[in-house]
Each structure stands twice: as C-alpha cells, then as structure tokens.
C-alpha cells in the first residue's frame, strides 16, 4: 500500500482533486505517434509527459525512442491539510524518481570495476578446466555473476537515458596488479569505482592517496574494513547485524522460556553478551570437531516451556548438526525455535534442509531478502533474455549495488549529501547510508527474516 504522509503547517486549506506521480513506466514510441496520442493512451496530459522528459520541449519524438510515462495517483478532495503542506509518496523518494526530477543535461558517468577474473590463470583451451571452474560457487563464479549484475544494472539505467562509460580491470587477486591499475588514467578519472572484492585488496587500494576523492564501493563482504574517506561499505557491517538481532531477542524472547545458547570457541564475545542478557539461559559447548551430543541436547530441551535456541557459529558441521538435531526434537508437546545473531553462508549449503529451518522458525538478520515468487518476475525474465540464465544472488547483488550507487553519484557527486534520502529498496537488497567517524559511508540497512515452511518472510518491526 502506498503511504501518503501529510505534514500539517499553519493554515487549514482544502486540497482539490489532483494527481501525484506514484511510479513511472517506459514507453517505446511507435510509428506516427504524437505526444497527444500517447497522453490519450495513458489518460494523462501532455504536460505530464514533458515534466519527465524535458528534452521533448526542444526536440521531436523519434520512433523507437524510450520516454518516461508517469503513473498518476489521485488525491481525494475530502483530505484537508494546511496551506503549503508537504506531500510525500514512497515512490517519489526513490532515487530513480529523484534523479528524473533533478536530471541534468549530461547524464553520463565513468565507472571503473575492479574484479578478480584471474584471466591469466585460466586455460580457456581446456574444456575440462573451464567446466570445473563452474561446478561449485567459488571466487571465479562469484566474480562473473557479480559482473553480470553490474552489466544488467547499466542496461537497466539506459531506460532513464543514463550513459555509463564502463572500464573493467582484472585485479588477478594480486596487490602488485592493483598498484598498476591505480596509475591508470581511466581509473583516476572515474566518477565511482566498484571493487576490489577481497577485503585485504580493497583496503590496500582505498589507501592510495591519489584516489582518495573517488568513491570506492566495497560490495560483497561483511568482514570489517576501515571506512575512511572515499570508502562506501555497501554491505551492512557484521556488528550492526548482530546488534539489531540482539535487540530483537531482548524484545521478543521471554526470560521465563527455556533459552539455550550454543556457541563455539570463536564466538566467546557474543556468547558472554548473550549470557549477560539472559542470565538463566543454559550454555552448551560443542564437542571436538563441532558436534553436539544428541543425548545432551535432548536432556536440556523441555516440554513444559517453549525452547528458544540461539546458535553462534560459522562452522558448518556444528550448524548442520544443531539444525538436524533440533528439528528431530520437535513434537506436538515440544516447541523449539532457532535464532542466531549472525547468519553466515554455511546455512546456504544444500545439505541443510530448508524445511527443517522452517519447522524451527529460524530467525536472523540479513543484508538481503530472497525473492519469493511462484512465477517468473519481470526482472528475471529480462535477465534471462539478456544472459540466457536465471539470476542468482550474486547477480542480484551486483545489480542492486550498482544501480543504487550510480543513481546516487548522478544525483550528487558529494555522496555524503545523499545520506539525507530515505532507505532505498531494490530486488533483494536495501541501502540506508550513514557517515562513519573515519570519513566514509556505511550501509545501515538490513532485514529481520524468519523461515516459515519452505519460504522466508520478513519480520516488520512496529
């Protein structure tokens, strides 16, 4: 539901029926079409079209060109507001809508992308070697998929008449190579740089003084980096994900429930913090090689109270063991729920049954929310037509990060000023940037998600 917020000022004043732009669509001009015929087709005024396409005031319509068409939403006469009221619609606060309103004549920018393609180490003449690269998710496949997402975002932005000069560099996952790339004039003349992917490489590159003024986007990892001037940490840092989940646990877990904390030796700090918050909780230490004895877990879960289990680990064997054992403990008399303050990629392993996570109502914070659709979306269909496959999470991440940062740079090259805008949502990610004390920007946005049967739902906090 689209929300309309009305700010009441000094004097009451009736608003008569009018329209606001709630969204936009792209129209491809057909043969013999005029501005008037297009306006009649969409039941809008010619002035509405000119508002979003100012270049048409000075030039004629061209066949097969794309123009923006406003989708108008009526504001009813019965609404009374005060004079000079401010009306704000969710869609009007989106960056693409803001860009359309602030559009400058020159909607071009230079984008440099630094990714570890490692093209010099791949024997492309060997079919077996190339095929083996794509068998599992690895740095090479992540790089290619993320790059595909970047290309898709650039293609998408063409509909807004945005031109991107793309320069791609293979870092070869080498610090020496990064030094060579940093001296390239194309990089030094960039409006924005995406990459490198690897935290160590990114920190080295972001410390190069000559590139300090150019925004550099760290796109994928939650591993902490120094968010110095020019650095854009697009992934919400791990500590913020944890803190948000801790707040959720404090507000939603009953201290009288049977709370069990399972934490490995690498998570002593969060283990201690949770134990302080829930002093009556039961603590379980994993056995050698990250396993929990089934008889121990069985003895600590009860039928008389809800069982709330918090697991803190990034060891796959432990996570897999806990999920499987907890699921087997669920009965009509025994209720078991699972939580974590940080969900790593280990939970994505196919050997962890998603139905088990659903049975446990597994709850956590995340930087992204997977699309839950029974049918192919417009986004997926267009990607399929362009690239011949369905987009995975790395593709979508590449798309989301790229579209957001390019729109920000086009709106205002001083990215600090774009922190005033509302949270921006895309396909699976959202962005709400804040200023770090070291001078850079970090994304503070996240989802609280819960598994339900085979789906994942977002928990909207009131």
Question: Predicted regions span which residues?
Answer:
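Periplasmic-binding protein-like
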Residues: 186-198, 217-219, 257-264, 304-322, ...
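Structural motif
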Residues: 165-184, 290-300
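Segments of small-molecule ligand-sensing domains
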Residues: 388-395, 402, 406-456
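A solvent-exposed, charged loop/short amphipathic helix patch at secondary-structure junctions
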Residues: 120-141
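Extracellular LysM carbohydrate-binding repeats and other cell-envelope/extracellular binding modules
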Residues: 18-31, 37-86, 120-122, 222
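Extracytoplasmic ligand/sensor domains, especially the bilobed periplasmic-binding protein
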Residues: 194-195, 201-274
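Bacterial Sec-dependent N-terminal signal peptides
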Residues: 1-26, 457-462
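Extracellular/periplasmic periplasmic-binding protein-like sensory domains
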Residues: 323-397
């Amino acid at each position: 539901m689209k929300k309309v917020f009305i700010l009441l000022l000094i004097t009451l004043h009736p608003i008569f029926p009018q329209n606001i732009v709630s969204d936009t669509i792209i129209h491809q001009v057909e043969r013999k079409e005029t501005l008037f015929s297009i306006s009649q087709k969409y039941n809008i005024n010619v002035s509405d079209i000119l508002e979003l396409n100012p270049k048409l005031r000075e030039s004629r319509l061209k066949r097969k060109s794309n123009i923006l068409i406003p989708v108008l939403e009526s504001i009813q006469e019965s609404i009374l507001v005060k004079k000079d009221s401010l009306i704000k619609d969710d869609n009007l606060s989106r960056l693409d809508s803001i860009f359309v309103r602030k559009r400058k004549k020159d909607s071009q920018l230079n984008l440099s992308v630094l990714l570890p393609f490692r093209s010099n180490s791949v024997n492309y003449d060997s079919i077996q070697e190339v095929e083996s690269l794509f068998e599992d998710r690895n740095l090479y496949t992540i790089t290619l998929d993320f790059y595909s997402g970047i290309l898709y975002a650039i293609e998408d932005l063409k509909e807004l008449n945005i031109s991107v000069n793309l320069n791609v560099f293979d870092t070869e996952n080498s610090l020496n190579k990064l030094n060579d790339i940093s001296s390239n004039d194309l990089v030094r003349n960039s409006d924005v740089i995406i990459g490198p992917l690897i935290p160590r490489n990114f920190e080295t590159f972001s410390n190069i003084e000559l590139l300090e003024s150019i925004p550099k986007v760290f796109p994928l990892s939650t591993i902490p980096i120094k968010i110095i001037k020019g650095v854009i940490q697009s992934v919400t840092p791990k500590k913020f994900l944890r803190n948000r989940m801790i707040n959720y646990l404090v507000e939603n877990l009953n201290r009288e429930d049977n709370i069990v904390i399972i934490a490995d030796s690498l998570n002593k700090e969060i283990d201690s913090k949770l134990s302080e918050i829930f002093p009556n909780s039961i603590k379980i230490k994993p056995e050698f090689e990250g396993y929990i004895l089934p008889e121990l877990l069985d003895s600590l879960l009860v039928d008389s109270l809800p069982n709330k289990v918090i697991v803190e680990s990034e060891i796959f064997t432990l996570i897999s063991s806990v999920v499987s054992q907890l699921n087997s403990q669920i009965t009509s008399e025994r209720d078991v729920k699972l939580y974590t303050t940080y969900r790593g990629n280990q939970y994505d392993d196919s050997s962890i049954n998603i139905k088990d996570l659903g049975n446990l109502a597994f709850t956590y914070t995340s930087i992204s929310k997977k699309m839950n659709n029974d049918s192919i979306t417009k986004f997926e269909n267009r990607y399929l037509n362009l690239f011949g496959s369905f987009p995975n999470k790395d593709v979508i991440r590449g798309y989301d990060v790229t579209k957001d940062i390019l729109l920000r740079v086009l709106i205002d090259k001083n990215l600090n000023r774009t922190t005033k805008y509302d949270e921006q949502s895309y396909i699976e990610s959202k962005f709400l940037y804040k200023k770090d004390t070291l001078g850079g920007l970090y994304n503070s946005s996240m989802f609280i998600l819960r598994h339900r049967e085979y789906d994942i739902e977002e928990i909207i906090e009131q």
